UniProtKB/Swiss-Prot annotation:
The modification O-AMP-tyrosine is found at residue 398. The lineage of its organism: Bacteria, Pseudomonadati, Pseudomonadota, Alphaproteobacteria, Hyphomicrobiales. L-glutamate binds at residues 265-266, 322, 328, 340, 360. GO terms for molecular function: ATP binding; glutamine synthetase activity; metal ion binding. Binds 2 Mg(2+) ions per subunit. Residues 14-98 form the GS beta-grasp domain. NCBIfam families: GlnA. Its cofactor is Mg(2+). This is Glutamine synthetase. The gene is glnA. The keyword Protein biosynthesis does not apply. It catalyses: L-glutamate + NH4(+) + ATP = L-glutamine + ADP + phosphate + H(+).
Amino acid sequence: MKTAKEVLDFIKSNDVKYVDLRFTDPRGKWQHVTFDITMVDEDFFAEGQAFDGSSIAGWKAINESDMLLMPDVTTACVDPFFSETTLSVVCDVLEPTTGEPYGRDPRGIAKKAMAYLQSTGIGDTVFFGPEAEFFIFDDVKFKADPYNTGFKLDSIELPTNGDTDYEGGNLGHRIKTKGGYFPVPPLDSAQDMRSEMLASMAKMGAKVEKHHHEVASAQHELGLKFGQLVTMADHLQVYKYCIHQVANIYGKTATFMPKPVYGDNGSGMHVHQSIWKDGKPLFAGDKYADLSQECLWYIGGVIKHAKSLNAFTNPLTNSYKRLVPGYEAPVLLAYSARNRSASCRIPYTNNPKAKRVEVRFPDPGANPYLAFSALFMAGMDGILNKIDPGSAMDKDLYDLPPAELKQIPTVCGSLREALESLAKDHDYLLKGDVFQKDFIESYIDLKMQEVARFEMTPHPVEFEMYYSV
């Protein structure tokens, strides 16, 4: 559907009862408000709907709280999970007095990033392809009270359940630590669930490809077809929503926390990127690994700004429990063809149209609109300023001698470091008014609240290490 009239015709012919308007907050979570169909007409889509922005963390103060949700009718689809027929529509957030995009709206930032590309003349389209991993548990308990702090996770797949009593017996098929990549059922216990997740995403407009079990016990990944920056961020929101919903229907619970389990692999979100112009791939050329000079400069920009990028690509305190050596996490800021230990990988392909950069340090806790936009702006800064990424590193970086390893820069070691890096290095984000300084400052304040709570809260491991000191 491309016009409000088409949406209204669809509503009538499909007996739609409600329209659900959705938008993304600065932390990356979908929010929504549902309207009875008697409220929906052409003006509903043309004029937008007012709401209170002061209730959204990181947005307006209560004395200037009015904001406007403007539906993007091209995103309209029937939500497959609601009992009453409900049309879901993704919205942009506007200033009600001017009708201009709100500077702190993540989707608005992503749209400005695409406009910025076209204004430079370097390209007309930027494609993104995220690979977001996640865990599914049968039972999760956690508490963060001053006198009772801890968590407990359970899944039928966990190796610790080898002697657990189950109704009907313990059937014994269990994935070992770091042994979960690609096994068939019954070791893979979630085949049908993942298929249902993929099917529900397709119903909501996402372009789907595949699904499989991941390395850790209870860890999974579904594949989305790459798309333009804003569309792909929209689809990743659908991806997360459908995974949460289907897991819930199965009586299970999904999480996109980067590192919920100590000692096993964490969940990453490798992000493939490429720029096109006039229907031709800008990243294909005759340089290293058949890349263009522009692509190498793009990589140079990502590596140069990686520490400030971490504030958007790895925005949780938990993100930095994944970004440690030894768990397939790409902490070293280098690039290579096919080498998965480098933070920027060039996937092998003979097809010039498939030439792309895979940035491997992001995780699924990221707000996709902000993460994709920031990665793109860093790469564009590399192209515009011809930033040399240095020589490629084709050997296994984790096997380098300590002296050589110290010469390679790394991603941040904590969210505090990432936010401090963003405070110092953000001029590249301000170009084209894509990110506004006001948003960056408010984002840092918002995330620093999380850092402060985490740093001030005693941890169970500290009791284990220090209680008897």
